[in-house]
Regions:
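Acceptor-binding helix/loop patch of EC 2.4 sugar-transfer enzymes
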Residues: 23-49, 89-133
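Nucleotide-activated donor-binding/catalytic signature segment of Leloir-type glycosyltransferases, i.e.
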Residues: 232-255
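Aromatic "clamp/platform" in nucleotide-sugar-dependent glycosyltransferases that forms part
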Residues: 272
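Conserved donor-binding/catalytic core segment of Leloir-type glycosyltransferases
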Residues: 182-200, 206-209
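Short hydrophobic beta-strand element within catalytic cores of glycosyltransferases
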Residues: 289-292
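Carbohydrate-associated surface elements
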Residues: 148, 170
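Short alpha-helical donor nucleotide-sugar binding micro-motif in glycosyltransferases
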Residues: 259-264
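Conserved acidic donor-binding segment of nucleotide-sugar-dependent glycosyltransferases
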Residues: 307-314, 323-328
Length: 369
């Protein structure tokens, strides 16, 4: 991570087996590891059989580190929800940050492909959910970035809602700015999505684009994300015949992303689920008219400053794009108000003050016990 020079980074390295997907290379990494322990064997064999063990192994290594380093005032964990946290929680004030329950990712991935082997592979990959469902209900202090995630964590992980505090994520509002000097392309659409990730609903944006090509011959879609060669999204683009109208851009800085918004006319968030939709507030901060699904956390983020549509509805998306392109000045005025909404509610000063309060409360409550 990129850290301030005043922040000390303590590394707790595992085998790092996901640096490669070659079995031979992974085996070499495992064999070269000196003084192997049970946790290393678990990490290797779980990965070998298609699992993702890193959350569990990190939690165990963090517990071991904290057993001999007790100088910390509080421990903040980001979504590992691992067994090790239950032991850490007995010795330290613990604040667990959960973006959303990964049960949602699992659910939507199963909907993407119904073949037996695919479903079996997903079952193995998400096998860590069994651990998380056991650990989450026992955590005393949880922070999540939206009320929708709070509801889903309570439901899917059987957590008492009183233990879950909502603090929105913040945004660099001085980076995601309108860039009014950049001329907008009147028929350029933009979205942020990881190709082949079912949750992001990119399929519906692509199908909508195809349906609009007759009415708007110059229309195009820029996707902030990476296209997987030969993957589902790549095949769909070929099937729809829109290869010359879809452009993927990766490895952009925040400033470059903001400038992409500035040169576009409509931002689209066609997600099926968002624990906290960063693309939503990034687009709004850049004063671009926004179309987003009314799914999960999105309505509570956008307020009255975006055009909301049902998820998986290509016709509604196409009609919304037409409406905005045909009445752009009206929707641009809404977008200007939308930026002020983001400034008021998602600036880092507000968010950090809320985190300071919950951190102080977590420490005080621990020492009262």
């Amino acid at each position: 991570p990129n850290l301030d020079e005043k922040v000390n980074l303590i590394k707790l390295p595992g085998l790092d087996l996901f640096q490669t997907f070659s079995f031979k290379d992974r085996l070499k990494i495992f064999i070269k590891k000196k003084n192997k322990r049970a946790i290393d064997f678990y990490e290797f064999f779980s990965t070998f059989f298609g699992g993702f063990p890193e959350m569990r192994t990190f939690g165990e290594r963090a517990k071991e580190f904290l057993d001999i380093n007790n100088q910390f005032d509080i421990v903040i964990d980001n979504q590992s929800i691992s067994y090790g946290l239950l032991k850490i929680q007995k010795k330290f004030p613990l604040l667990e940050v959960i973006h959303h329950p990964i049960t949602k990712d699992y659910k939507f991935e199963l909907q993407l492909n119904r073949s037996f082997m695919y479903r079996l592979s997903r079952h193995r990959w998400y096998s860590f959910l069994k651990m998380q469902k056991k650990v989450a209900p026992q955590l005393k202090k949880i922070v999540t970035p939206s009320f929708n995630s709070r509801k889903d964590i309570a439901s899917d992980f059987s957590v008492n809602k009183e233990n879950i505090n909502v603090i929105n994520n913040g945004l660099d509002i001085d980076i995601f700015i309108p860039y009014n000097e950049i001329k907008r392309n009147p028929t350029k659409l933009i979205t942020t999505a990881s190709a082949d990730v079912a949750l992001k609903g990119l399929d519906y944006s692509l199908k909508s684009l195809e349906s609009l090509t007759d009415d708007f011959p110059e229309i195009s879609l820029t996707v902030i994300g990476k296209l997987k060669k030969g993957g589902h999204t790549s095949r769909l683009i070929d099937e729809l015949g829109i290869k010359d109208k879809v452009f993927f851009k990766t490895d952009l800085t925040k400033e470059e992303i903001a400038k992409e918004y500035a040169s576009s006319s409509i931002a689209i968030v066609s997600s099926l689920y968002e624990g906290f939709g960063y693309p939503v507030i990034e687009a709004m901060s850049c004063e671009i008219p926004l179309i987003a699904t009314n799914a999960s956390s999105i309505p509570e983020l956008v307020g009255d400053y975006a055009r909301l549509i049902p998820p998986k509805n290509t016709n509604e998306l196409s009609n919304s794009i037409r409406s905005i392109l045909n009445n752009y000045s009206h929707y641009k005025k809404i977008a200007v108000k939308g930026r002020q909404h983001i400034i008021d509610n998602f600036n880092w000063l507000k968010i950090t003050e809320e985190y300071e309060d919950i951190i102080s409360k977590t420490i005080n409550d621990f020492h009262k016990c």
